[in-house]
């Protein structure tokens, strides 16, 4: 597959990718607060479904802390191909003090700025935004 083909597909899928990211950002998966335990589980469940929607298999594995999500893509003749590990985390930091937020941190928005469009919301740059690059 040529690089131009891959880049064209990324451009074609951009709006859908942003919608997927905004969905994940709406889940308040704050792992440092036990009150958000169910939200962390919900984020893991969401990721399993999202990975599966991309044509991969995915499973949620329990750990002593929060669940780990593992996805696999198994192309034909994969036994002779190298393995690639894509690692990231789906939890976010607390929003305290909430008074410093201009908007609800879990109601992400695409905003126009002087430097172009940005996505604002808790986790958009640590680490849900990076996680969704797959």
Q: What are these model-derived regions, one by one?
A:
Residues 2-131:
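Acidic/His- and Gly-rich active-site-bordering loop/insert found
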Residues 134:
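Carbohydrate-associated surface elements
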């Amino acid at each position: 597959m040529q690089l131009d083909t891959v880049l064209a597909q990324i451009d074609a899928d951009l709006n859908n990718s942003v919608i997927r990211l905004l969905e994940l950002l709406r889940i308040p998966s704050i792992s440092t607060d036990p009150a958000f335990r169910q939200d962390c589980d919900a984020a893991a469940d969401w990721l399993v479904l999202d990975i599966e929607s991309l044509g991969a298999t995915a499973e949620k594995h329990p750990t002593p802390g929060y669940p780990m999500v593992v996805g696999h893509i198994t192309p034909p003749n994969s036994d002779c191909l190298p393995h690639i590990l894509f690692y990231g985390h789906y939890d976010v930091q607390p929003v305290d003090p909430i008074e410093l937020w201009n908007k609800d941190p879990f109601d992400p928005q695409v905003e126009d700025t002087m430097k172009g469009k940005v996505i604002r919301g808790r986790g958009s740059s640590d680490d849900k935004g990076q996680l969704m690059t797959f």
